[in-house]
């Protein structure tokens, strides 16, 4: 891949994708990144190396214009409330065939299209935090202006940090509920297991180690075989300890509670889509 990739804002997600590209062998001379301060620049240079062009913007548009000019893919990595302003700022500097990728939650393709030149190829991405360790899930939706080869390029870029799945944009709220916020559910489960372990007589440190390692190990098994029901059945002996625990979970309403929580998450995602619009200011 010799495409030029620009990262506007290099927080956790954009920084992880840039690092993933370098680890995959992408030429650092074809990677540009913007930061707001010299302190951030020094930290990013330590992470990405001195061959990546890192531009300090100080909050001004000129730096983002420099990074954007002639780029094949432009990743917008600022917070959702800053996306509209950033998209408008870079619009004059975009090449007509540059693909603009937003990783901001709740910002729709329509909102982005209203800020960018007519016909600009746009991709909306919902990543999750395991992308920072190369084990993420990144759901994408695209405008009709994105060509197949451009989509493949974006998938190649994002694929350096995890699994890329294309969905319809009207499914993004559901995606947010499943994979976007999903890692926190696993963390909460580990937290609950550790708390219960303490009540059963373990010290706090041991309980947390056991719970965390167990959830991580189960995740690894799912990574190698994504058939959760089969994996569950394989470790559940009739009339055994695991069956007793699982029955307690199910009888206590685990499935119903999970659905309620995820519906709440999806509803909040839909609300956020109404908050970040091109006419917000």
Regions found by a protein language model. Name each.
Residues 178-179, 190, 275:
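Catalytic, metal-anchored helix/loop core of enzyme active sites in primary metabolism
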